[in-house]
Amino acid sequence: MGLIVDTIRMQYLNNVRMDLEYKIQLITQTRSELMTSCNDLMQVGNDYDSDNPIVKTLNQRQAKLKLLDQKLEQQMLQYQTKLKMVETEYNSCRARVDKNIQHAFSYQ
């Protein structure tokens, strides 16, 4: 019975792992796009005088983008931590399955 439960648990954990990896990938992609946007704002801002109101608006937008990037980084760290936990539990289930299989097929 433990073998079946552990096998089902492993399938569930594998699905959770794939979901977390996908979310991490999306966040990484979004952060890359944010950095590109920040760099574009910096390049546009360099064309204007520093006292120009447009530059102030661009700096505010850049600050908002950096704040969003920090939030995404925190979210990604949370997902990475959850992923490590899932992988640890998956390995534990895998070890129990291997032990149950070895015990089932050993002749004593």
Residue spans of the language-model regions?
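Amphipathic alpha-helical polymerization modules
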Residues: 1-108
